[in-house]
Amino acid sequence: MAKKIVGFIKLQIPAGKANPSPPIGPALGQRGLNIMEFCKAFNAQTQSMEPGLVLPVVITAFADKSFTFVLKSPPATVLIKKAIKLDKGSSKPHTDKVGKITRAQLEEIAKTKTKDLTAADLDAAVRTIAGTARSMGVTTEGV
């Protein structure tokens, strides 16, 4: 018989940098999960990735205090900032522009995000990522 699921925990954690401090410790502790076991498993699974790259993770907590977790692709905003070497987006995105991104860069980001997007094809995914870029105050070229 399948284990009874008691909840899902969604977090965004830098690759290879999971530790028991907030927000990880309190979120897992509320469900009675082994915090250090999660931190070791997460860090082991993300050691081949770029250190510090923010990754969304969905942790499934079971009634017997065990858990599983699924890593998602990094948020589009993080990938856009990395592609054009930005620290943060514009506070007034429609008036203050902070950079430019090309179609080739958008396609690269869309390919990275394909498994987590609901877009029908690459072109639709590129348009989705371009919309995110525009909402950050980044000018899109060739879209």
UniProtKB/Swiss-Prot annotation:
Keywords, sorted A to Z: Methylation, Ribonucleoprotein, Ribosomal protein, RNA-binding, rRNA-binding
GO cellular component, one term: cytosolic large ribosomal subunit
One GO MF term: structural constituent of ribosome
Presence of keyword Protease: no
Keyword hit for rRNA-binding: yes
InterPro entries membership: Ribosomal_uL11 (IPR000911), Ribosomal_uL11_bac-typ (IPR006519), Ribosomal_uL11_C (IPR020783), Ribosomal_uL11_C_sf (IPR036769), Ribosomal_uL11_N (IPR020784), Ribosomal_uL11_N_sf (IPR036796)
GO biological process: translation
Pfam families reported for this sequence: Ribosomal_L11, Ribosomal_L11_N
Coiled coil feature spans: none
Posttranslational modification: One or more lysine residues are methylated.
Assigned protein family: Belongs to the universal ribosomal protein uL11 family.
Subunit structure comment from the entry: Part of the ribosomal stalk of the 50S ribosomal subunit. Interacts with L10 and the large rRNA to form the base of the stalk. L10 forms an elongated spine to which L12 dimers bind in a sequential fashion forming a multimeric L10(L12)X complex.
Known function: Forms part of the ribosomal stalk which helps the ribosome interact with GTP-bound translation factors.
Protein name: Large ribosomal subunit protein uL11
Source organism of the structure: Methylibium petroleiphilum (strain ATCC BAA-1232 / LMG 22953 / PM1)
